Regions:
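Post-Walker A helix-loop "phosphate-sensing" segment adjacent to the P-loop in P-loop NTPases
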Residues: 66-76
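C-terminal leucine-rich, beta-strand-based interaction scaffolds used for sensing/assembly
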Residues: 82, 224-227, 245-273
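Walker A/P-loop nucleotide-binding motif
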Residues: 43-61
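Conserved P-loop NTPase "ATPase switch" module shared by AAA+ and STAND
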Residues: 78-83, 88-117
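Substrate-engagement module of ASCE P-loop NTPases
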Residues: 117-131
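Amphipathic alpha-helical "lid/sensor" segments that cap RecA-like P-loop NTPase cores
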Residues: 1-5, 128, 138-150, 155-254
């Protein structure tokens, strides 16, 4: 582990964290996406893994990070840009890992400002071939216009929802067999219903009292938790848009959100407020 720039207590915490990652990694099913991310981080100094909630961004990033230890990299899990500047060591191969870069449900302006302030310093550090960054990022955060102010993190994107990166039916079946064991065959017709299939498998694995077919067909508890988190995270804009989608039966017109709307539409909205 890192000895020169990282405090001993942080080293101990990271060692414990890596042991937990290794234990959790026993449930990882090797995918084409994971192989692609590994190839990208080996040939690029900074890689951002994007996708919607539950598609396996964090799990994939951690799996690839563990593989990089085989190339002599020390792994350091950080939450802010100052840590990268503080703990970077030109004499050691270091892979910095970041979860939910710049926010979860919406782009967090405070986080963005921090990364903007340190952007050039970090860019300079990455000129050292032994220093790399791998981050996971929600797609709605990554696609925010302001995220373009961080070109380091847009230079190499691995979007787990793209056709060449998304899980194949064979990979989904292997994941189901890993987590559901004998129940995997019961849900084979539902594996393509939701992008967050990997999350559903993990949730079922953690609570096997659930009825497998009902859960994978209609995972209402997952939706409920995500909606609650939108409110908790104060993502009021997205919360309101979701409400509008429900009110208008998922038939929102773009001009209703970007232009002045007529009185009839205003009355419909007021009626449901």
């Amino acid at each position: 582990m890192l000895k020169d720039t990282v405090p001993w207590n942080m080293m101990e915490q990271m060692t414990t964290k890596l042991e937990k990652w290794k234990e959790e990694d026993q449930m990882f099913v090797e995918t084409g996406a994971a192989k692609h991310v590994l190839k990208c981080i080996k040939t690029n100094s900074c890689v951002t893994v994007t996708g919607s909630s539950g598609v396996g961004k964090t799990f994939t990033v951690r799996h690839v990070a563990l593989q990089m230890t085989g190339d002599g990299y020390d792994i350091l899990h950080v939450t802010n840009p100052e840590d990268i500047v503080r703990f970077s060591n030109p004499n050691k191969k270091t892979l910095f890992v970041i979860d939910d870069l710049c926010g979860t449900y919406t782009l967090n302006q405070t986080y963005l400002d921090k990364w903007k302030t340190m952007h050039e310093d970090i860019k300079g550090l990455l000129k050292n071939d032994g220093t790399k960054i791998m981050a996971s990022c929600r797609l709605q955060v990554y696609q925010d216009e302001q995220f373009k102010l961080l070109p380091l993190f847009t230079a190499c994107e691995c979007n787990l929802l793209l056709q060449n990166m998304s899980l194949s039916d064979e990979e989904k079946q292997l994941i189901a067999e890993k987590y559901l064991k004998s129940d995997a065959s019961k849900i084979s017709q539902y594996i393509d219903l939701f992008d967050f299939f990997p999350l559903l498998c993990r949730l079922y694995y953690e609570n096997q009292t659930l009825n497998a077919v009902d859960f994978f067909k209609n995972p209402f508890s997952v939706y409920e938790e995500e909606i609650d988190k939108l409110k908790t995270e104060k993502a009021y804009g997205k919360y309101c848009v979701l409400a509008l989608c429900v009110m208008f039966n998922n038939h929102l017109k773009e001009e209703w959100l970007t232009e002045d709307i007529n009185e009839d539409i205003k009355q419909i909205i007021k009626k449901h407020m």
